[in-house]
């Protein structure tokens, strides 16, 4: 048997150099192996032949057997189309094509018997099937073969006659060459224990299943394997890291922590905060490097927990550092932490790109001597000139905004890697967290401090703008501030949505007595900061902005968030924007403004937003609606999880199950030396070579 991974796809029957080039560029298919692992996205049952008299326009797909009675062309220019009148003796349907008219008239013969497959629609009382699949009836076995696979293709592929049907034919050719079993990629013990189909059977049946039951078994086998190796990679990496990096032992909770707890704590900790703090304290004293992800909705008190963790580092003679993605957020953390530590003998400094000259020199010197105990900053803290006396704990806010390499540079700031606490206000569904941040232990703050009023979310149509502005005026008259967010900076030729510039002028006219500031992504940082400062200080009553305000603005007096063209935003983005209000004691409102015409999934998104403020429920729904590759931040996380068949949203239970299976193997075989696991470690090594990011997790 030849090696599928090295056999060039151009040598497969029906491919050749030209088609191979298209497959290379469009789908990343270079070898026989790549094609074999290009799975169908759906299957259509072609086991039944319908009679024309049975069909109506509401049926999804149908298959007919009959003959072409004749052809005619209709329309002019771009509307020109070929119509074939097709009959099986019980009625007539019109087969319609808008392209390739000459070719089709030459290809199909009148009064010859064909199998036709497609989606019926009704137009002017007649049944039509546009661009159907047609095969000569003599090839009935090829067409009516039960479940037919459908493969995703691109426009460029279709222009090269590489549609789903063409890929299916290539796959038949490839599967026909598998005359002996492929090398197994799971151990005999795993196959037996979990009742998994052998690899060769699974691959043949995923492309050409003999029935629904066999298809389910093939899918299960391939999903199990895919998710299993993702988890085995993450868990093996975590185990190796624990062995390699011992981590500082923070033995005590001392005077600094206790003094803060008894005198400076602004309010009683919630039960969730207490639980998370216990988890962190346990990690810090365990003698292994902490690598923990702290999730919590906006306003849940993550910063307070992070500060108390840093105070434990100080009590044990170490320094702590907090890294934020923007200057505004770093400034905000600095002000908050200084306020919380008021009256305590703790030196806190802020280091951003704006800090220069003698001030910067004094901070760098203080870090080297250990006088600066807590440093808060942006990516400026990872510059080569920044060195610590004894960095023991690093807190990273908004993890997904830092690349793997940036985070790794923090490790070089200490004799051995410091403890790492990653904070995010972007709720990550449990299943996605296991894949994206699987080597991090996860803590969740899932309750808000007492006294916070839930934000009221309302969906309003564009036409109700008069009543909307009346409500805004009432809030401003009561001394509150308002955000108005737009999805685009300037008008697009293709999409006519409200843009920020127009919106800004309109709001200035509508509220002439108010100061309106404007913030968008194309501004210079200094200009943006100046505009934001107008709003933070209360000088401006209204901020008109794009989504740059998702992270980093804390204005307790802002009580209204209006999101224009809310249909243009994803669920997680809407939730993050909503989190800019509801930070004070007053009732806050989030108003989602849309047009009347909404797609079904958009309607669902808006209904979820109106129904719940729970970030984790929203994140799970977003994952189901959009898929993991679209979720904010995941593409920048530095982790490849380009799953070919498994679905993080739908296969959450299986992911949990295979994680436990992988954990058992890593625990029993930490050195990868047991003979029964040889296949698994060999396959993992091969996957790490082909998936470049697998070696650089979190």
Language-model-detected regions and their locations in the chain:
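OB-fold nucleic-acid-binding modules
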Residues: 38-69
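Upstream accessory/linker segments immediately N-terminal to the RecA-like ATPase cores of bacterial MutS
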Residues: 74-264
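N-terminal cationic and glycine-rich segments that engage phosphates or anionic surfaces
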Residues: 130-139, 393, 409-411, 422, ...
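N-terminal pre-Walker A segment at the start of P-loop NTPase domains
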Residues: 267-277
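Inter-lobe coupling/hinge segments of SF2-like helicase ATPases
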Residues: 275-278, 286-607, 671
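Accessory helical-bundle/CTD segments and flexible terminal tails appended to RecA-like ATPase motors
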Residues: 513, 532-542, 549-556, 561-564, ...
């Amino acid at each position: 048997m030849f090696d599928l991974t090295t056999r060039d796809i151009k040598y497969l029957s029906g491919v050749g150099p030209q088609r191979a080039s298209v497959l290379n560029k469009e789908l990343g298919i270079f070898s026989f192996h790549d094609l074999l692992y290009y799975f169908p996205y759906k299957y259509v049952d072609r086991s039944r032949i319908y009679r024309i008299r049975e069909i109506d326009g509401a049926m999804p797909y149908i298959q007919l057997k009959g003959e072409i009675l004749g052809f005619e062309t209709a329309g002019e220019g771009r509307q020109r189309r070929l119509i074939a009148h097709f009959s099986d003796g019980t009625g007539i349907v019109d087969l319609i094509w808008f392209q390739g008219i000459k070719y089709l008239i030459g290809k199909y013969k009148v009064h010859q018997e064909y199998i036709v497959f497609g989606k019926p629609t009704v137009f002017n009382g007649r049944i039509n099937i546009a661009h159907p699949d047609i095969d000569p009836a003599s090839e009935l076995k090829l067409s009516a073969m039960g479940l037919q696979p459908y493969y995703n293709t691109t426009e460029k592929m279709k222009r090269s006659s590489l549609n789903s049907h063409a890929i299916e034919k290539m796959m038949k050719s490839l599967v026909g060459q598998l005359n002996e079993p492929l090398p197994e990629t799971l151990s005999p013990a795993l196959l037996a224990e979990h009742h998994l189909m052998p690899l060769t059977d699974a691959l043949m049946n995923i492309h050409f299943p003999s029935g629904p039951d066999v298809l389910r078994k093939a899918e299960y086998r391939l999903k199990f394997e895919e998710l299993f190796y993702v988890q085995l990679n993450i868990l093996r990496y975590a185990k190796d890291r624990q062995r390699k990096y011992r981590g500082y032992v923070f033995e005590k909770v001392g005077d600094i922590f206790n003094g803060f707890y008894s005198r400076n704590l602004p309010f009683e900790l919630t039960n969730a905060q207490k639980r998370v703090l216990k988890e962190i304290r346990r990690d810090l004293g365990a003698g292994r490097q902490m690598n923990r992800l702290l999730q919590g909705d906006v306003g849940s008190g993550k910063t307070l927990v992070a500060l108390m963790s840093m105070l434990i580092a100080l009590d044990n003679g170490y320094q702590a550092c907090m890294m934020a993605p923007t200057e505004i957020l770093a400034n905000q953390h600095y002000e908050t932490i200084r306020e919380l530590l008021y009256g305590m003998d703790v030196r806190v400094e802020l280091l951003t790109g704006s800090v220069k000259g003698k001030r910067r020199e004094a901070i760098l010197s203080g870090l080297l001597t250990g006088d600066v105990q807590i440093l808060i900053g942006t990516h400026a803290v990872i510059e080569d000139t920044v060195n610590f006396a004894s960095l023991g704990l690093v807190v990273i806010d908004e993890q997904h905004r830092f690349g793997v390499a940036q985070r790794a540079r923090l490790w070089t700031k200490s004799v051995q890697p410091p403890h790492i606490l990653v904070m995010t206000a972007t709720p990550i569904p449990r299943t996605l967290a296991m894949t994206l941040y699987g080597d991090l232990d996860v803590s969740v703050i899932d309750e808000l401090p007492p006294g916070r009023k839930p934000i009221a979310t309302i969906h309003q149509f564009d036409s109700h703008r008069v009543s909307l502005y009346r409500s805004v005026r009432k809030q401003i008259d009561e001394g509150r501030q308002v955000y108005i967010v737009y999805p685009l900076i300037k008008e697009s030729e293709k999409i006519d949505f409200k843009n920020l510039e127009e919106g800004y002028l309109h709001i200035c006219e509508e509220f002439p007595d108010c100061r309106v500031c404007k913030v968008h992504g194309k501004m210079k940082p200094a200009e943006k900061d100046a505009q934001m400062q107008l709003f933070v200080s209360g000088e401006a009553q209204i901020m008109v902005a794009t989504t740059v305000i998702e992270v980093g603005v804390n204005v307790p007096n802002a009580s209204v968030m209006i999101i224009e063209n809310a249909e243009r935003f994803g669920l997680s983005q809407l939730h993050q924007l909503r989190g800019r209000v509801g930070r004070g004691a007053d009732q806050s409102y989030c108003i989602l403004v849309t047009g009347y015409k909404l797609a079904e999934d958009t309607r669902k998104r808006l209904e979820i937003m109106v129904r719940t403020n729970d970030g984790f429920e929203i994140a799970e729904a977003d994952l189901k609606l959009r898929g993991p590759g679209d979720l904010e931040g995941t593409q920048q996380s530095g982790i490849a999880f380009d799953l070919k068949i498994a679905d993080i949203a739908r296969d959450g239970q299986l992911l949990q199950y295979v994680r436990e299976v992988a954990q058992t193997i890593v625990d029993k075989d930490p050195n990868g030396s047991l003979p029964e696991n040889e296949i698994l470690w060999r396959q993992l090594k091969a996957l790490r070579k082909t998936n470049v990011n697998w070696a650089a997790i979190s």
